[in-house]
Every structure is written in structure tokens, then in C-alpha cells.
């Protein structure tokens, strides 16, 4: 995939991800938290990852693994990528010039709740790793550990790890 197409794919995924109101600091968004974990699970599964949603540590933890079968004779490295899908509350009344849960571009920058912390980074990693898998250029095994409690102190993540 060429760079513009890859960037378009990243942008589309980030738009979908930002639209999910995964606010961990307010219990009324518990259903949105569940939907976000399921959305991540589905994206990872459709791209060849083994995925489990782990409960019992606060909000669900998405744990995904991709075992690279290419060049299986060589000893491969294993990379763990950590991130979080939960966000802080946001509203136009707090100074947002647009809907915080709708990704917008302004002056070459993306605006939207989570675009910087941490949904944007997760999508950069996911988009890149998925493309490397498709091109059969991924030379290592990859795991993603994506939690939904970072904005509330990551309680329980130490027990999970």
C-alpha cells in the first residue's frame, strides 16, 4: 500500500476510534467502554491476531498476539506494544471548537478526544503492524496490551501483567 493510502486507512480508523466515547472516569459510559474493547478486538481479529478481552481488572483489557509464521526457522524477537483506549470527558462547554468525539483536521493537525492521548498512537502502531503483516514484512511476533483504566490510574494492570 502506498503512503497516501496507508494514511487514509489510518485516518479512517482513527475517526472510528475517536467516535467511541470510552470515558473511564464516569460509570454512565460503561457500555461505551465495552463497545470500544469489542471494536478493537474485531479490528485485531480480522487482521490475523489472536485476541482475548480480559475482565476482572476494572475496565476490559484487550490482549492480542500475532505469531509470525514467516521465516519461522530464525529465532524471532517479540515486541509488546502498550496503550490505552480510555479517555477523559470532553464537551464543547470546556472549550472544544468542534465535537470532541468527531475527528476533525485543522491546520494539518487532528483534533478529537484521544487523538493525542492515546488513540492516535494506538492507531499508528496498529495500522503499521497490519500493513507489515499484509506485505509479509513483519520479522517478529507482536502483542498488543490495550487497557481501559489508564485515565483512572491503571488499577489492576500490575496484577494482569
What is each stretch, according to the model?
Residues 1-93:
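N-terminal helical capping/dimerization or prosegment-like subdomains
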Residues 71, 150-151:
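Short strand->helix junction
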Residues 5, 31, 35, 120, ...:
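Conserved active-site and cofactor/substrate-binding residues in soluble primary-metabolism enzymes
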Residues 156-161:
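Short, intrinsically disordered, charge-balanced linker/junction segments flanking boundaries
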Residues 12, 38, 123-127, 155:
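Short, contiguous clusters of charged residues that form electrostatic/catalytic patches at enzyme active sites
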Residues 76-146, 152:
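Active-site metal-coordination/substrate-binding segment of hydrolases
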Amino acid at each position: 500500500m502506498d503512503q497516501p493510502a496507508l494514511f487514509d486507512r489510518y485516518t479512517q480508523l482513527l475517526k472510528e476510534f475517536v467516535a467511541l466515547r470510552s470515558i473511564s472516569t464516569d460509570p454512565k459510559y460503561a457500555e461505551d467502554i465495552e463497545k470500544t474493547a469489542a471494536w478493537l478486538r474485531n479490528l485485531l481479529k480480522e487482521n490475523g491476531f489472536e485476541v482475548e478481552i480480559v475482565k476482572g481488572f476494572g475496565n476490559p483489557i484487550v490482549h492480542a498476539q500475532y505469531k509470525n509464521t514467516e521465516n519461522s526457522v530464525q529465532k524471532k524477537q517479540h515486541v509488546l506494544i502498550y496503550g490505552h483506549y480510555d479517555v477523559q470527558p470532553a464537551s464543547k462547554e470546556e472549550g472544544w471548537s468542534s465535537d470532541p468525539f468527531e475527528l476533525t483536521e485543522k491546520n494539518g493537525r487532528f483534533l478529537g478526544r484521544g487523538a493525542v492521548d492515546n488513540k492516535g498512537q494506538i492507531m499508528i502502531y496498529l495500522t503499521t503492524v497490519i500493513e507489515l503483516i499484509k506485505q509479509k514484512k513483519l520479522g517478529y511476533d507482536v502483542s498488543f496490551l490495550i487497557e481501559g483504566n489508564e485515565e483512572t490510574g491503571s488499577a489492576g494492570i500490575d496484577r494482569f501483567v
